[in-house]
Structures are given as C-alpha cells and as structure tokens.
C-alpha cells in the first residue's frame, strides 16, 4: 500500500523536487513549502519510489494535505 507524504504546515508549494518514478531515501526532500517567509522541506518518511506528486508549484496546501505518494 502506498505511503502518503503529508504537509505538516499550511503553505505555498515553492518547489517540487521529485517526480513519479524517482527513487528517494528516507529524509530526502520531495517538496519545499514556503510558509511564514521560511522554506520548509517535506521529506520522504522512508526509502522508496515516488508514484505520484499531488501538489504543483504555486499551489497552496493545507496542513494534513497529501502532497505525494511513495511505494
């Protein structure tokens, strides 16, 4: 079952660093959010393959939103 990567803070997607098919390690940044004038990386909770990125640059995401899926 895929694992969700969720936003832990409300913010604007500043940069998408991974795309479907990319292999990532635990702690690798997948998306960078901008919130309160700070850049906050959303990291992979474990090693795996990105199967979907659900957020686009410039989009606002809310705390708890799923921004990517890992397999």
Q: What do these predicted ranges mean?
A:
Residues 1-12, 32-45:
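Short beta-strand-turn/beta-hairpin segments enriched in glycine/proline and small hydrophobics
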Residues 6, 20-21:
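Short, flexible segments with low predicted structural confidence
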Residues 15-19, 52-55:
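Short histidine-centered loop motifs in beta-beta connectors
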Residues 21, 38, 58:
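Surface-exposed, flexible loop/turn segments at secondary-structure boundaries
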Residues 25-40, 62-71:
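Short hydrophobic beta/alpha edge segments that flank linear recognition/processing sites
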Residues 48, 53, 58-67:
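PDZ-domain C-terminal substructure recognizer with occasional recognition of PDZ-binding tails
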């Amino acid at each position: 079952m895929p694992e969700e990567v969720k936003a832990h803070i409300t913010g604007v997607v500043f940069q998408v660093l991974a795309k479907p098919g990319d292999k990532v390690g635990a702690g690798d940044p997948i998306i960078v959010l901008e919130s309160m004038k700070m850049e906050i990386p959303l990291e992979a909770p474990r090693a795996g393959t990105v199967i979907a990125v659900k957020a686009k640059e410039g989009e606002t995401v809310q705390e708890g939103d799923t921004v990517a899926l890992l397999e």
